[in-house]
Amino acid sequence: GAAGSMLGSGAIVVMDETTDAVKAAARIVRFFSRESCGKCTPCREGTTWEEDILNRMLSGKGRPGDIETLLKAASNISPGVYPVAAWEEGGLVAVPFPPKQTTICPLGPSSVAPIASAIRRFRSEFEAKIDEAAHATIEVSVGGGS
């Protein structure tokens, strides 16, 4: 609009300290992935990648590099909206409005904010999921015992 806002598109999610931030992010991304009409490659592919990676992390199979891949997928959906360098500084990030248009509608670019915020604010929880996968043990029977 004339005010440079997207009135009606904002959301505030309140979670307590018992909430699994990775699980919450996965549920939000699942919404965007399911709501995508599939016409735009950045939205269709990007949200699917994000959902797959988060589900892999939740299933205990997270991989080193998954966080960076999530951020890369987000930047492919809506380039330039959340510069990685600003995340590393830990300060507030100015979000340009309107975002660069890579999709027909704002659904894809809207999917970037929840993932970016979750990683920025709860990165240690994402890293813990990857560490859990790295330290997982698998029981293997040895020998042909009867």
Where do the model's predicted regions map?
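Redox cofactor-anchoring modules in respiratory/redox and cofactor-processing assemblies
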Residues: G1-S146
